[in-house]
């Protein structure tokens, strides 16, 4: 357990309005502050899960969201509630020492991690904490050394994967890798990114640098990835999906009592060692449930930038989405709820909804200014 950051009444708290909140740097939204928690190694025990559930109810509006970066975030936190929330979570080793350490510890770990992967993630976290690398807020690492990578489609800039004979280090956007001798190699690749101008203006991603034709030394073929699994039984336990990635506090408590939890970037939780999960509010265990085809941000009024309500609309359209397809309903053109292309995207505008086919929320629309009543006819 680390020492809790000392936040006192009247202390200045850095509040951001962009896409990258933290626990120590919350984000202002339409329903209050958003506080994002990064569980160490992507793991939660029952006490930690209970503390998060308690904090959501005591200091927020009770909403807990699973993010696409395998974190959790609490919504509806009032400014006066932030300090006691941080203190409560610090008692369970869920808070970093300061904002800089929190920002650097952006590590995505495969939920199917074994002891080797856990040790790698811990060593990488320690090396990042000891470094002074001025990495952009979204710059992240993926520890994915299983027999087959499962995180290749998920956000990371530097990836640790397994080749035929040894661990590999790969820059995102390149299909060639280099041997990994230690986590110091991962930090060296991050320094290379900075030295090559990848973070001009304090922003930047590895894939964007690679797209400019700047590439690190790498000659080994990267392993072929597999798509992420759906909810249900896996060798390590049970994967539990949540509608729109939102987990009710008591569901989080109950799941954690059934086994240690592993975070995923797929808005699911892995309950380690479980062979059966009882029905719980918000839980989706059927891999063909139509709600799994939906992506939607919180929408209005939770987000001040959203121009329409999103999730009830998405639910009403779920049965119209073919199996294997994705419908994304976005409250604005930023597309926070799903940064990827979707088979159909509905983007709210001041004139109604725009329909984008096989694209993202800000892409050119096939139809514009649609009323919600028109949507079932055009999907």
PLM region descriptions:
Residues 97-101, 194-203, 372-379:
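Flexible helix-coil linker/hinge segments at domain or subdomain boundaries
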Residues 351-379:
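Glycine-rich, small/acidic residue-mixed loop/short-helix segments
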Residues 161, 167-170, 219-236:
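Phosphate/diphosphate-binding glycine-rich loops and adjacent basic-rich segments that engage nucleotide
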Residues 78, 178-181, 201-209, 213, ...:
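Short, solvent-exposed coil/turn linker segments
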Residues 81, 198-227:
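Terminal amphipathic helices with adjacent charged low-complexity linkers/tails
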Residues 173-201:
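Internal alpha/beta scaffold segment
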Residues 7-26, 227-229:
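Intrinsically disordered, low-complexity polar/charged tails and linkers
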Residues 2-13, 29-170, 175-180, 184, ...:
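Small-residue-enriched alpha-helical segments and adjacent helix-cap loops
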């Amino acid at each position: 357990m680390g020492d809790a950051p000392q936040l006192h009444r009247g202390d200045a708290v850095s509040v951001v309005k962009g896409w990258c909140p933290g626990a120590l740097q919350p984000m202002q939204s339409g329903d209050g502050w958003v506080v994002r928690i990064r569980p160490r190694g992507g793991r939660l025990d029952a006490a930690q899960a209970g503390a998060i559930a308690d904090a959501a109810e005591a200091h927020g509006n009770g909403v807990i969201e699973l993010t696409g970066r395998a974190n959790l975030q609490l919504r509806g936190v009032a400014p006066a509630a932030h300090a006691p929330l941080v203190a409560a979570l610090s008692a369970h080793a869920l808070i970093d020492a300061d904002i800089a350490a929190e920002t650097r510890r952006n590590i995505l770990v495969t939920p199917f991690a074994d002891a080797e992967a856990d040790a790698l993630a811990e060593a990488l976290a320690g090396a990042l904490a000891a470094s002074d690398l001025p990495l952009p807020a979204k710059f992240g690492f993926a520890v994915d050394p299983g027999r087959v990578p499962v995180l290749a489609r998920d956000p990371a800039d530097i990836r640790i994967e397994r080749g035929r004979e040894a661990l590999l280090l790969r820059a995102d956007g390149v299909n060639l890798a280099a041997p990994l001798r230690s986590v110091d190699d991962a930090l060296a690749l991050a320094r290379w990114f900075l030295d090559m101008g990848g973070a001009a203006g304090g922003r930047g991603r590895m894939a964007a640098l690679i797209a400019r034709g700047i590439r690190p030394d790498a000659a080994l073929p990267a392993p072929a990835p597999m798509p992420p699994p759906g909810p249900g039984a896996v060798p390590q336990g049970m994967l539990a999906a949540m509608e729109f990635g939102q987990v009710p506090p008591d569901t989080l408590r109950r799941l954690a009592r059934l086994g240690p939890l592993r975070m995923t970037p797929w808005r699911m939780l892995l309950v380690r060692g479980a062979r059966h999960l009882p029905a719980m509010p918000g839980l989706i265990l059927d891999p063909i449930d139509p709600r799994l085809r939906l992506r939607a941000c919180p929408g209005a009024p939770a987000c001040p930038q959203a121009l329409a309500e999103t999730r009830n609309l998405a639910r009403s359209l779920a049965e119209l989405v073919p199996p294997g397809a994705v419908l994304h309903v976005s409250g604005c053109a930023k597309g926070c709820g799903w940064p990827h292309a979707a088979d159909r995207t509905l983007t709210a505008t001041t004139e109604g909804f725009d329909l984008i086919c096989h694209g993202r929320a800000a892409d050119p629309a096939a139809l514009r200014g649609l009323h919600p009543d028109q949507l079932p006819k055009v999907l």
